Amino acid sequence: MKGRIITDKGSMVVEFFDKDAPKTVQNFIGLAKQGFYNGLKFHRVIRGFVAQGGCPNGTGAGGPGYSIDCEVLGENQYHEKGVLSMAHAGKNTGGSQFFLVHDRAQTQHLDKKHTCFGKVTEGLDLVQQIE
């Protein structure tokens, strides 16, 4: 399954890991279809690490009003460049916030702790341009 993330820098095509993280993919797509992400900013950008978005109030403290369980046991649970992963404040506390990985070198410690649920397959250069 594929989707598109549209930013002010351009658009990216994402291939979702629906076998690894079916509930996370379903949650993300459901929020997107409801327009939840429309107009939201990437509120946390750390060069060489991640660009994080999905907070409705832009501070990193907001969410959809519920939490989903982590899904970290699949084959694609490695934070390499272009991976789309759930942000959370602890196990099973994610909801709407996600991040795009800039570089594998700085994100290995996130493997099997944050749910990887997709990867940018087109427009990968845009990940580095998000500010």
Question: Residue ranges of each PLM-predicted region?
Answer:
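Cyclophilin-like peptidyl-prolyl cis-trans isomerases
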Residues: 1-131
